[in-house]
């Protein structure tokens, strides 16, 4: 009998070991070894979280490290998401639609703000007084970003297209410099650089339209969300903590923005004033705004043939992660 029971106990031990290994694998799958997150001067939450180390604290017990990557614009954030350089990236709504329409496998899981972060900017002594005056002029804009798409939509309101102007593709801070130096006639600005141009350079906002500013989206790679859904939830909890902290501490937030972005405190305060943090769950409001904006992507032939950007909007926006987190915080 002893050999029989010995074999039974040996078999049981193998089963227990296998189950333990499976549970260990499941635990590992719930939390990756590293989470790569972008931070951007146009995303106050990312700056606050990085400043306080809240993501590092949230995942410390799991042994998960946080790697921060600077995004200078939506184009960079979306490139990093596409290449897998980051798992979470901060980008404008319409730029995110364009990226997904052209094959970038991302979902929008959180709205970090409703900003007025872009406008068309000219020098204080510029003779340009209207959008129509831009015909034949040089406009600095970062392709694949909200300011670039804002420019196209603005031109369409007066019957112009990008063929009627010369778009000079420069990253946002370089666009400000080019405007100040007279290398371009106008610039599709982005905060905090736009606020700095206003306050420090005396630049003038030629055309403003809050409705043409699309939302600040936190996007996640589809592969990451599928493999680590619990990690996505935990990251969003930290983002929502930062959002609430910003609302309660505007002065401290402005100082963090100023320090991180290397701008003056008045510039940071102006940037912050142009953000609404009240609606963090992506949903019908964002869908409607983006579907209204989507035709410019087709009209300017920015998407692949046969792709309907309006349909892409529905596949991009995923409120399932943020909704319970925000509801629980109220």
Predicted regions and their residues:
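Sec/Tat signal peptide C-region and signal peptidase I cleavage site
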Residues: 25-29
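Conserved C-terminal helix/tail region of periplasmic/extracytoplasmic solute-binding proteins
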Residues: 298-330
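Short, glycine-/small- and polar/acidic-enriched structural segments
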Residues: 30-161, 166-169, 185-188, 205, ...
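Secondary-structure end/capping motifs
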Residues: 228-304
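Bacterial N-terminal signal peptides
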Residues: 11-23
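N-terminal secretory signal peptides that target proteins for export/translocation
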Residues: 1-7
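Solvent-exposed, polar/charged alpha-helical surfaces in well-ordered, non-transmembrane soluble domains
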Residues: 53, 57, 79, 83, ...
